[in-house]
């Protein structure tokens, strides 16, 4: 992203367009639940008839509808936080064409197998309405397939070539690639990053055309060539649970965890704050009585703290306010990465949030082929509604308590996903602290690793 593009796109040269007046707009996509929930026992309507926290139904795929790797899935709608369940999910088989069709002889010689195959699981946690999450669920896998097909020649090579289509300009090109340490997995990571960016642009166009607003986080797992790639943009989370190990597979991106990046942007482009916010962080919101006093603060270049004398400009609302799950960017948004939010502005202002948001995911690679897998080794992916009330250790305890005693049950991973959600609802046998209930939408995938590569009978 060039500085020139950034200035043209986000900085005042011309006045920002006035906010759209409220009014009815057609959604760019119809509201729906994930395709693999069709035929499930709970009604697929927009909202459940009863939304009391103690009576919200948990939904899972119907018996006989098998997800990739026999993964389990469950979800629950929020407790009257919004009209719709703003979470979305998608999963299926990735079929990546290995080369373009040419003469039959060339095809038979170069491509003994037409497709490189993998699997895909994704969770999208929407905000500001369900539209962005639905668009992401409909779009991201197609973006990823296109990006992977563009680099498939490098994926199937022993070492990614410097040039595609077999060209070699410099005899030492393979050495340069080797010295850079470029591997096939780096091409998959690049494809994921580019797919997120492409999907973000699609969502922006669709929502703008329909006069809609909204965004979503995205947590995506991709299995390809014996490795599991976990791409995260937002505050959903994935962990690997084994008999003697709990391994985080994602990092949560919030205004607090990305404070320095966000402050740095405000330092370079102060116009983005429109004179209404201070980029500096203080332990609390400053008051008039703090003027002239030396107080603790930190800026974009600081991981530690120092003291400064309070000036009038320091009394403005902080760029990042609150801590933990309560931290907000420009008093508005609880995440710093995701898809969408192109039209989002601070209430009653023309101050845009999109310049501070990234659609680029962090990608973690799990080399599944190198693990000595046990039958009960699983990856748990969930939106933040689960992690708001359950820790990694509590989730792992539930996994280890349930799976060993149910190894003959073909639906055990689905039942485990349901049990994890029930544990967020404050039941008497729940692990959560007394009275601790998740009122948010909650969506969970439980992906067993022992059956990796097993074909799904229904995608």
From Swiss-Prot:
What Pfam families does the record point to? Answer: PP2C
Answer whether the UniProt record assigns the keyword Nucleus to this protein: yes
Which annotated residues bind Mn(2+) 1?
A: 125-126
- Please give an example of a GO cellular component term from this record: nucleus
**Major location, coarse class?**
nucleus
Show the ranges annotated as biased composition (Low complexity): 38-48
* Entry's EC annotation: 3.1.3.16
Q: Provide a GO biological process annotation.
A: signal transduction
Name recorded for this polypeptide: Protein phosphatase 1M
* Species, as recorded: Homo sapiens
The gene behind this protein is: PPM1M
């Amino acid at each position: 992203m060039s500085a020139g593009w950034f200035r043209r796109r986000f900085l005042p040269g011309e006045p920002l367009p006035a906010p759209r007046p409220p009014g009815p707009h057609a959604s760019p996509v119809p509201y729906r639940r994930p395709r693999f929930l069709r035929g499930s026992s709970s009604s697929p309507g927009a909202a459940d008839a009863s939304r009391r926290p103690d009576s919200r139904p948990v939904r899972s795929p119907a018996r006989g509808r098998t997800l990739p790797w026999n993964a389990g899935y469950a979800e629950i709608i929020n407790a009257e936080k919004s009209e719709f369940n703003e979470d979305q999910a998608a999963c299926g088989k990735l079929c990546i064409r290995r080369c373009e069709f040419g003469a039959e002889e060339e095809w038979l010689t170069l491509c003994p197998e037409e497709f490189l195959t993998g699997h895909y699981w994704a969770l999208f946690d929407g905000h500001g309405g369900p539209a962005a999450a639905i668009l992401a669920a409909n779009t991201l896998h197609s973006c990823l397939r296109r990006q992977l097909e563009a680099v498939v020649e490098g994926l199937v090579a022993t070492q990614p070539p410097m040039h595609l289509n077999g060209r070699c300009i410099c005899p030492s090109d393979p050495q340069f690639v080797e010295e850079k340490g470029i591997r096939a997995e780096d091409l998959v990571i690049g494809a994921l990053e580019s797919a997120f960016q492409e999907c973000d642009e699609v969502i922006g166009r669709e929502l703008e055309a329909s006069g809609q607003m909204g965004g979503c986080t995205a947590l995506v797992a991709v299995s390809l060539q014996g490795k599991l790639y976990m791409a995260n943009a937002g505050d959903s989370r994935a962990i690997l649970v084994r008999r003697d190990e709990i391994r985080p597979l994602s990092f949560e991106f919030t205004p607090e965890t990305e404070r320095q990046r966000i402050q740095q942007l405000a330092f370079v482009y102060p116009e983005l704050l429109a004179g209404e916010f201070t980029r500096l962080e203080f332990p609390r919101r400053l008051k008039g009585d703090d003027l002239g006093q030396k107080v603790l603060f930190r800026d974009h270049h600081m991981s530690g703290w120092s003291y400064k004398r309070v000036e009038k400009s320091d009394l403005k609302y902080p760029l990042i306010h609150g801590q933990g799950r309560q931290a907000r960017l420009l008093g508005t948004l609880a995440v710093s990465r995701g898809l969408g939010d192109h039209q989002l502005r601070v209430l009653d202002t023309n101050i845009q949030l999109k310049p501070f948001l990234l659609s680029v995911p962090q990608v973690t690679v799990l080399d599944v082929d190198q693990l000595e897998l046990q039958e009960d080794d699983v990856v748990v992916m969930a939106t933040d509604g689960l992690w708001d009330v359950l820790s990694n250790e509590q989730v792992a305890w539930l996994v280890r308590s349930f799976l060993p005693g149910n190894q003959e049950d073909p639906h055990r991973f689905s039942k485990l996903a349901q049990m994890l959600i029930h544990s967020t609802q404050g039941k008497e046998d729940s692990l959560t602290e007394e009275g601790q209930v998740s009122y948010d939408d909650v969506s969970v995938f439980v992906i067993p690793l022992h059956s990796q590569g097993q074909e799904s009978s229904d995608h």
